[in-house]
Amino acid sequence: MKRPIVVINPNSNQSITDGLGECLARFNNNKSHPIECVTLKNGPFGIESQLDSDSVILPLANFVKTRPDAGAFVIACYSDPGIDTCRSVTSQPVFGIQESGVLTALCRAERFGVIAIADASVERHRRYMSRMQVLNRLAGEIALNITVDESANGSDTFSRLIEVGNRLKEMGSGVILLGCAGMARHRGKLQSELGIPVIDPTQAAVSMAVGALLPN
């Protein structure tokens, strides 16, 4: 029986979900646990504030409860909204992309940097990393100050990613973590430009989900 890894985009922007599907396509050679990317239709167009993040907690938990067929869930928003609540309503593993991305970055370099979408996101991310007890490994976090939609579709987003990535390198980052699921399609090109590892947190979370579902 196929038990999909369900990747949930908790905002209602379908283009973000489509971009996630493109970036995760290589994982679909796992026939037992295919990747299924879904959009939370009643979510905000972009999760850019604490209020946006809090507003999707119950809709996410309710969606998770409707999918007992899933092998695992990935919450594809860098704020990891509702991760504790979702874990409380299912026996399947639930992975948040910030938690997974940070843990992956720590395996690649002594210090990591994060590219956020907006200044308002940075404090929210730092609270979460404080909970994870990893702030001593954070070289810095710098915002692009764009919207979630622009992170995937903006005409000058890639040039801003290069600029901010180089600033984080100067601050001592040995690896860069993309702080928004919408940036996923830029990972490979950005890594080539910067010359250091660039982590897409959704790919990191799906990798962990695949590992969790390996047969004994």
What residue spans do the PLM features occupy?
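N-terminal beta1-alpha1 ligand-phosphate binding loop
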Residues: R3-N30
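Conserved beta-alpha
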Residues: G96-M132
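Short hydrophobic segments within beta-strands
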Residues: I8-P10, V38, I115
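Active-site rim beta-loop-alpha module in soluble metabolic enzymes
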Residues: A120-C180
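Short, acidic/small-residue loops that bind anionic groups at enzyme active sites
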Residues: R87-R108, L190-A209
